[in-house]
Amino acid sequence: MGLFNFLKLVSPRHRIYHKASKIANEVEGHKNYYRNLTDVQLLEESNKLVDLVTKQNYTILDVAVAALALIREVVYRETGEFAYRVQIIGAYIVLIGDFAEMMTGEGKTLTIVLAAYVSALEKRGVHVVTVNEYLAQRDATNATKILKRVGMTVGCNFANLAPHLKQAAFACDVTYTTNSELGFDYLRDNMVHRFEDKKIRELHFAIVDEGDSVLIDEARTPLIISGPAKNEFAAYVAVDRFVKKLKEDEYKIDPESRAPALTELGIKHAEKNFKTDNLFALENSDLFHKIINALTAVKVFEQGKEYIVRDGKVLIVDHFTGRILEGRSYSNGLHQAVQAKEMVEIEPENVIVATITYQSFFRLYNRLSAVSGTAFTESEEFLKIYNMVVVPVPTNRPNIRKDRADSVFGTPNIKWLAVVKEVKRIHETGRPILIGTANIDDSELLHNYLQEANIPHEVLNAKNHSREAEIVAKAGQKGAVTISTNMAGRGTDIRLGEGVAEMGGLYVLGTERNESRRIDNQLRGRAGRQGDRGETKFFISLGDALFKRFAHDRIERAITKLGNDTFDSSFFSKMLSRTQKRVEAINFDTRKNLIDYDHVLASQRELIYKQRDKFLLATDLSDMIDKMLEKFVEQFCDQYRNPKNQNLVNHIALSEALNLELNMHGVISPKLFENMTFDATVHKTHSLIGEKITNKVKVLTPPIALIRFREIMITAMDKHWIEHLDNVFKLREGVTLRSMEQTSPLNVYIRETDILFQTMLQKIARDVIIQIANLATPEEFDEELMKANALKKLQALREAHEKSNEGQ
C-alpha cells in the first residue's frame, strides 16, 4: 500500500467512507435473503432486531447490515424504489453520527428513512429535523407508509399542534419536526409545572436534513421565548427621528462587520439632542443601546433583504434561504427599532423568558447527524462545534453538469441588462432557466425587467412561499423561467420535463456570488441531478455586495478600468474565491465567538433545567429544601454581623428580621442568640427554621406539602432565571465597552456571569425559604381568618358608635 493510500485510510473522512462502503457491500449480499421473505416474515425479522438491541445488549451497529438490508427490501415493496449503493453508504454515515454530503437528487430523503429505521430499533426515539412544515409533513407521510410495515410508528410535530398531540408525536419511534418548533418545544418543556406535561421524551438521536442550513446559517439567531415588558414607544420614536436626521459625517458603518457607530460629531449631536453631558455614562447605557439599534435599523438594514413588512408586521428574512423566519424577532430592542423605522405598530420590548442557540441545543443529543448537498466547505466548523465528520458520498451516476466561468461586469445596471439578454436567448430555445438572486429586492427588480421584456416567469421568494413546491416542481419543464431567492433548503427536486435533457438540461443562472461558496454550490446543484445534463453560470458585477463590503479598495480601481465592458476573468474569479474564503472565516469566527459566550450560559441553563426536573420528579423535597435553607441562613445571618467583631452577630436586629420576614414570632427572641459566635448563630437559626418547616409538613400532610412546596420552588426558580437572563444579556452587550482592564471581554463575561449566577441561586433560596416559612397551614389560615373577622366586627361597631354620636 502506497503512502497516499495509507494516509487516505487513516484520515477520519476516508476511514469512515471505507467502512461505509464495506457495509454497503455486505448489505448487497443479503439482498436475496430478504427478497424471498413474505411481508409477515419481514415484520417478524424486524421484531427480532428490536429484541436483540433492547433486550440482548446488541448495538445498532452490530445489526446495521441486517437492518439496512431489511429496510431496503421494505422500501422497494412499498415504493418500487430499490435504494442505491450510495444511499446505503449515506445511511451508515448518518447512523454513526456524522455528516453525509450527498448531491441534490441523490435521494437524501430515502437515505434518512434508512438510517432512522436502524436507530429506531433502540426504541428511544429518532428526531428527523427539516427546515419547514411542508417538508416535515410530506416526509412523515411517506415514511409512515414504509416504517409501519416493520412495526415502527411515525409522528409529525409542527406549530399550533395541541399539547397531547405533540406528546403523541414525540412518543413515536420516528418524529419529523421543524428545527425551530423542536427548539421551542424544548424550551417550553423546561417551563412546565408538571413533569407529565413535557412533550419531548428524550434527546437521543437527531438527523438534520439540510444540515448546513440549520446548523450554520440559522445558528446565528438564538431561539427566544419572550414575555411582555414595559412599552417605551416614545423613546423608540425619539431615537428613530434623531438617527434619521444624522449627517453622513456623524456616523460610520464598518464595511466588513456592518457594525454602526457614532463619530465624534455624532456623539456631540446626540449629547446635545438628548440633553446629557456624557453619552457613555452608566445612566445613559439604555439610550446609547437604543441609538446603536436605530443606526442598525435605519442605516444598515434594508427592507427586502434583512426583513419584509407584511400586514403591518416586521418579518425577519433568512439571509441565506430567502425564507421568512416564522415566530422569530430581533432581540434586545432591535425589532422595535425596525418597527419605528417602518412606522408600523411598535410592540413592547419583550423580556427573555427562555433562550437557546441551535449550537447548544443540538449538542444536547446523545448522537447527532446530518445530510446536505453542500457541507464540505464548512468541514472544520462541523467537526469543531458538532463533532461531526463531513463525508462526501459519490453520485450514483457521473456528474456531467457544465459549470461555466463567471461573467464580470463593471456595474449592477449593466449586469442586469446582460442577465435579461441571456434569459431571453435561452428562453427562445425552450430550455428551462432557474435564476438565483441574493435577496427579495433583486428578485423583484429582475421580475420587472422580465415583464418589460415580455418573458413569462415565476418568482419564488419569502413573499410567495405558499406556492413554493408547485413553482419548484415546474421549474424543469420546457419554457419555464423561475426566479428564486436562494435555493437552500427548498427540499423539492427539479425534475426535467420531456425533451429538456436533449436541450442541455436545466440552465442555472446566478446573479450574484454569495458570502459563502456553499450557498453558490447549492444553487449550482439544482442542475445536473442524478446524471442529468445541466449548465450553470454566474453573472456578477463589481458593485455587488460581496465586493463592496470585503474588497472595496481594489474594486474601485477595477471599476474605472473595466467600465462598461464584460469579460470572463481568472483574476476576478481568484479574487472572488479569496474574498469568499475570507468572509467564511469571518462568519465562522463570529459563530465561534457566539458559542464561546453561549457556552457559559449553556452550562448554567443545564444546571437550572436539571434542578428543575428534580423538583418536578421528587417525591420528597426535604433534602433540596435543607440545602436551600443552608444557603439562605448563612447569607441572611451574614447581614447582621457585628461590624466591630465579625465573629459575633447583632442578635437583636437578627431576631427582629427573622420574626418579620419568616413569621417566627413566639419562636425566636434576642436571648436565644446572646453570646453566640457567628457559626453557632447560623447553626441555631438553621435548626429553628428547619423545625418550623418540618412542623408545616406534618400539619399540611406530606402529599399536600409536596405540592405546595414544589410550586413555590418552581415559581421562584423561573422568576429569578428570567431575571438572570436579562442581566446576562445586558452584561454581554456592554462587556466590551466596560472592559478597561488587561483581560479579554470573554474572561470578564465569564467571571461576572458566574457572580450573577451565584447571586441568582441565593435569591432563589431566599424566596423559597421565606415563602415556605410564611405558608399558612389550615389552622393558621383559620386563625388569621378569625382575626380578620374580629377586626371587621370591631370596625363595624366603631362606625356604628360614631354615627350614633353624630345623631345626638
Curated annotation (Swiss-Prot):
What the entry lists under Pfam families is as follows: P-loop_SecA, SecA_DEAD, SecA_PP_bind, SecA_SW
Write down the SMART domains for this protein, in alphabetical order.
SecA_DEAD (SM00957), SecA_PP_bind (SM00958)
GO cellular component terms attached to this protein's record: cell envelope Sec protein transport complex; cytosol; plasma membrane
Q: Does the keyword Cytoplasm apply?
A: yes
- Cell compartments where the protein resides: Cell membrane; Cytoplasm
Binding annotation for ATP: 87, 105-109, 493
Reaction it catalyzes: ATP + H2O + cellular proteinSide 1 = ADP + phosphate + cellular proteinSide 2
Q: What is its EC number?
A: 7.4.2.8
| Cystine crosslinks | none
Name the predominant localization: membrane
Give the family this protein belongs to, as stated in its UniProt record: Belongs to the SecA family.
Q: What this chain does, per the record?
A: Part of the Sec protein translocase complex. Interacts with the SecYEG preprotein conducting channel. Has a central role in coupling the hydrolysis of ATP to the transfer of proteins into and across the cell membrane, serving as an ATP-driven molecular motor driving the stepwise translocation of polypeptide chains across the membrane.
Q: What does the annotation say about its assembly with partners?
A: Monomer and homodimer. Part of the essential Sec protein translocation apparatus which comprises SecA, SecYEG and auxiliary proteins SecDF. Other proteins may also be involved.
**UniProt protein name:** Protein translocase subunit SecA
Its source organism is: Mycoplasma pneumoniae (strain ATCC 29342 / M129 / Subtype 1)
From which lineage does this chain's organism come?
A: Bacteria, Bacillati, Mycoplasmatota, Mycoplasmoidales, Mycoplasmoidaceae
Question: Gene symbol?
Answer: secA
